Amino acid sequence: MADELKMEKIDMVISLGGNFVSKKIKEMLRNTDICEHWEINKSGRPHDIFEHQTGIAMSSEIKFLSALLKRTRNNHIHPDNLKKLLTPYISKALNMIEGFTPSYSQYMAVRELELSLEDVDYDFVMHYANSMAVRLGCLCFSKRYIYCNRGINGIEGSISTAAGFSLATNTMVFCVTGDLSFFYDQNALWNSRLNGNLRIMLLNNGGGSIFYRLNGLDTSDMSMSYISGKHHTDARGICEQNDIGYLAAHNTEEYHNALVRFLTEQTKRPMVMEVFTDYKSDNLVLDQLDEQFSNVQKITSAENLQSRASDEIVPFRE
């Protein structure tokens, strides 16, 4: 989808916060030098995540947005204009996602988990570990706040973060993690004080499949061993040695059977549900989803939307 977006439509990019998860959007914005990029950063420390930063506005996000609202309040810009511009695309995209039926894969696992959590009768919080887990969570368009261990590009501490959170609350704490992040931080499960309110869904496809989606790495002879960390490890032994409940799924039927126990079974100790998939199948499903997004973008072209709304949208001018 990113390839089809017309860069000349972007006058300015304003970024707030820290690192940017989506590599596709980063690549899209890095491939244009037409628009300005201003970062809102109280410290003044540059990040230049799109590699053509114009400058930094040294301010807190709240103060900046408040000042922007004050400056533009009388320029006839109204939220309804933007809503009119974006609603057709967003509606079609949401309908597409709801109608998309993924085959057995990591995306299916996360989607089914999120859908099932809408029907539970207890409070809970959701953690997504890092990298692919975070991306899959974002694809589900959850209306709930989610926590993630996304720092720069590290995978360390994902399980420790969720485990520590679970000790500070009686609420159910769910954590969705990839295999590398889980095994890297398995020592978090040594803690004998952990309780049954910690539930970990482990997505195991034998390595870091995100790397196969990056241009160039998919053809590298070294990618499997030295970049994606290919392995043949599972979490059963780790769970047994730490008195952690363990469930496993290798197909759709096993997944749904395990998911019921994962969400409802009362335990005194944490539970891990390990979902085994194949990285090629995982990436195929994501490719299919990308294609659907591209089709939505073509049908609801930004050019047509802009022309229909141009009579009402008055751009800000200093």
Regions from the PLM with identified roles:
Residues 17-21, 43, 131-133, 180, ...:
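Short glycine-rich anion-binding loops that position phosphate/pyrophosphate groups of nucleotides
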Residues 15-17, 40, 128-129, 149, ...:
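Short His-Asn-centered micro-motif
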Residues 10, 53, 123-124, 178, ...:
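Local beta-strand N-terminus motif with an aromatic residue
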Residues 139-318:
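Thiamine diphosphate
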Residues 12, 125, 172-174:
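Structural motif
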